[in-house]
């Protein structure tokens, strides 16, 4: 039997990771044909995935954070083949927040993460397809808007490197006095809501922005996206909620959130609305978000909380 052929796509910011280098060597000694490609600029992940598909690679491994995972997943989804014919997807978490990996209980250590990919059969997983003014996008984890999105977009890269997830909290605290509500209309099957909101989560996965569990019950294999809308609140209540949400206090979120679970959602806003798609901001007045069932296959832990079984 021919050895398994993998293509690891590494975020260029993590080329100095010695643990990953050693782990790659270990997997090669175990008989896996493992090639490494490093991203340097926009479009590299798309190109590397295209080459992997053309080369008949069995598994594509994203080595990086949530943005790298989403880039690689999107590049796979752009191909016409279904999940069974495309390479499976694996993840070595090397980012600052690692929101998807945390919610999925994936191991952080590179050798453990690569070993899991080798040992676990890939499972069908959904992706979110987002249609907006500037063409279609794909999202593997969470699309977010409002307060949490501004925190993520504005968090300094140097601060993230030094402080990890704490950087998001510090940035969030600095914004508490200037939370501006956004007005929009949301509609989906048997769901409609219109008004001003300060935070929004559209979840294939559960958390984003450095640990904000906006969609705590979301599953990535149910064919549905979880919707969480935090309506505008007045005065100090809004500031307090912002602190609690950023600090991961889910009790505060549960008291005020509007929730739904739908296969698709339309969002219409009179003003430009920015959604953070796994770290990539996209601005539009109209979004259509669709959960595409079983778009890819992914290697995940046996008791992964994101799988419904």
Curated annotation (Swiss-Prot):
InterPro entries: ATP-NAD_kinase_N, Diacylglycerol/lipid_kinase, Diacylglycerol_kinase_cat_dom, Lip_kinase_YegS, Lipid_Phosphate_FormReg, NAD/diacylglycerol_kinase_sf, YegS/DAGK_C. Mg(2+) binds at residues 219, 222, 224. Belongs to the diacylglycerol/lipid kinase family. YegS lipid kinase subfamily. It is found in: Cytoplasm. Keywords: ATP-binding, Cytoplasm, Kinase, Lipid biosynthesis, Lipid metabolism, Magnesium, Metal-binding, Nucleotide-binding, Phospholipid biosynthesis, Phospholipid metabolism, Transferase. Binds 1 Mg(2+) ion per subunit. Ca(2+) may be able to substitute. GO terms for biological process: phospholipid biosynthetic process. Its EC number is 2.7.1.-. GO terms for cellular component: cytoplasm; plasma membrane. The keyword Lipid metabolism applies. Probably phosphorylates lipids; the in vivo substrate is unknown. GO terms for molecular function: ATP binding; lipid kinase activity; magnesium ion binding. It comes from the Bacteria. Pfam families: DAGK_cat, YegS_C. This is Probable lipid kinase YegS-like. It comes from Xanthomonas axonopodis pv. citri (strain 306). ATP binds at residues 39, 65-71, 96. The lineage of its organism: Bacteria, Pseudomonadati, Pseudomonadota, Gammaproteobacteria, Lysobacterales. The active site is at residue 280. Its cofactor is Mg(2+); Ca(2+). Residues 1-134 form the DAGKc domain.
């Amino acid at each position: 039997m021919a050895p398994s052929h993998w293509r690891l796509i590494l975020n260029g910011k993590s080329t100095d990771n010695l643990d990953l280098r050693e782990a790659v060597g270990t997997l090669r000694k175990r008989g896996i044909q493992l090639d490494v490609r490093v991203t340097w600029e926009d479009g590299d992940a798309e190109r590397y995935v295209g080459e992997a598909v053309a080369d008949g690679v069995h598994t594509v491994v994203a080595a990086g954070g949530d943005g790298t995972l989403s880039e690689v997943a999107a590049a796979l989804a752009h191909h016409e083949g279904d999940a069974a014919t495309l390479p499976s997807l694996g993840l070595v978490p090397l980012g600052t927040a690692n929101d998807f990996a945390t919610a999925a209980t994936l191991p952080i250590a590179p050798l453990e993460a690569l070993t899991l990919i080798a040992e676990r059969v890939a499972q069908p997983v959904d992706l979110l397809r987002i249609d907006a003014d500037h063409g279609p996008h794909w999202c593997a984890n969470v699309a977010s808007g409002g307060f949490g999105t501004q925190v993520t977009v504005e968090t300094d890269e140097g601060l993230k490197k030094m402080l990890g997830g704490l950087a998001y909290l510090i940035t969030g605290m600095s914004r508490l006095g200037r939370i501006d509500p956004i007005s929009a209309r949301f509609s989906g099957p048997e769901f409609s809501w219109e008004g001003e909101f300060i935070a929004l989560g559209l979840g294939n996965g559960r958390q984003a922005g450095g640990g904000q569990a906006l969609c705590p019950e979301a599953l990535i294999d149910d064919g549905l996206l979880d919707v969480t809308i935090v309506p505008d609140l007045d005065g100090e209540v809004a500031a307090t909620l912002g602190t609690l949400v950023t600090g991961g206090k889910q009790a505060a979120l549960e008291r005020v959130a509007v929730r739904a679970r739908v296969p698709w959602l339309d969002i219409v806003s009179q003003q430009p609305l920015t959604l953070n798609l796994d770290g990539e901001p996209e601005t539009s007045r109209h979004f259509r978000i669709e959960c595409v069932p079983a778009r890819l296959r992914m290697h995940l832990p046996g008791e992964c909380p994101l799988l419904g079984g």
